[in-house]
């Protein structure tokens, strides 16, 4: 099987299964998914709290539990992303695709516009790809990787705020408030970032199912067993 070394396009058969996503990458994917399932509802409630919480105040710690769940999930989210960055250096080529987009090559751009036309249903593109196709790779980097980094930085800054100026957390993260003007702006941007990543997640799920149905390769299965398998031969 012949594969383009830069874009990952399958150029010629005979086709054979390819081990694409290593176990740490697959584990990271599902850990981040679970963390987001906690972060989104708790983050929404923190940003838009209920007007009142019933019950005896001495026994009601409802909002404290919400904050605690958000903070724990956020730390898992941040540590998992840091480990994912580390694995990009020590893992296989597909593990680096999330962070390195080969925009300097013509074959990548050809695949990018081919996939864009296919997703818009204006042209038929039957290329096969090992790992992410160029359009998916660009979206994963520009929307998910950068969006996740933004959420981690602003989230750590908001977490540090409770310690007060002059403390070690604020000495490390206080520059974020200086950069964006004030804590309220950071809080607003962090809240908007939640909707941004949630929108990406919806689009991501749609594209994954679409690719698994319409493309010539397994997509959902590869994130469970790591293997990319093929349903047809590559285009001539």
Language-model segments: residues:
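Membrane-embedded alpha-helical bundles that constitute the cytochrome b-like, heme-associated redox core
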Residues: 1-236
């Amino acid at each position: 099987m012949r594969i383009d070394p830069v874009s990952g396009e399958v150029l010629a058969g005979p086709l054979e299964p390819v081990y694409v996503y290593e176990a740490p990458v697959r584990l990271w994917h599902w850990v981040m998914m679970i963390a987001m399932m906690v972060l989104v509802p708790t983050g929404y409630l923190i940003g838009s709290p209920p007007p009142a919480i019933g019950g005896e105040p001495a026994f009601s710690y409802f909002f404290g539990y919400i904050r605690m769940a958000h903070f724990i999930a956020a730390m898992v989210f941040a540590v998992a992303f840091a480990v994912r960055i580390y694995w990009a250096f020590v893992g296989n080529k597909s593990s680096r695709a999330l962070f390195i987009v080969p925009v300097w090559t013509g074959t990548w751009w050809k695949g990018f516009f081919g996939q864009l036309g296919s997703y818009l249903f204006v042209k038929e593109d039957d290329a096969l790809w090992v790992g992410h196709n160029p359009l998916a790779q660009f979206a994963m980097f520009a929307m998910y990787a950068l969006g996740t980094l933004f959420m981690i930085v602003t989230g750590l800054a908001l977490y540090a705020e409770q310690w007060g100026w002059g403390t070690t957390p604020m000495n490390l993260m206080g520059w974020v408030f200086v950069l964006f003007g004030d804590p309220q702006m950071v809080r607003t941007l962090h809240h908007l970032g939640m909707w941004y990543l949630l929108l990406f997640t919806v689009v991501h799920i749609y594209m994954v199912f679409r690719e698994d149905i319409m493309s010539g390769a397994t997509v959902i299965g590869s994130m469970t067993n790591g293997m990319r398998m093929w349903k047809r031969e590559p285009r001539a």
